[in-house]
């Protein structure tokens, strides 16, 4: 599962972290600087 979250959106970043997601890399997305979060489900 992946999520693209704007760097300025700390609430969504905290939610992703609480779900166990980690930052994979920084990416530009639709003109915004974002983080790509992911989690591996087994």
Segments predicted by a language model, with ranges:
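Acyl-donor (CoA/ACP) binding surface of acyl/acetyltransferases
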Residues: 1-42
């Amino acid at each position: 599962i992946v999520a693209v979250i704007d760097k300025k959106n700390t609430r969504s970043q905290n939610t992703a972290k609480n779900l166990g997601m980690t930052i994979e890399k920084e990416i530009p997305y639709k003109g915004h600087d974002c983080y790509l979060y992911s989690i591996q489900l087994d």
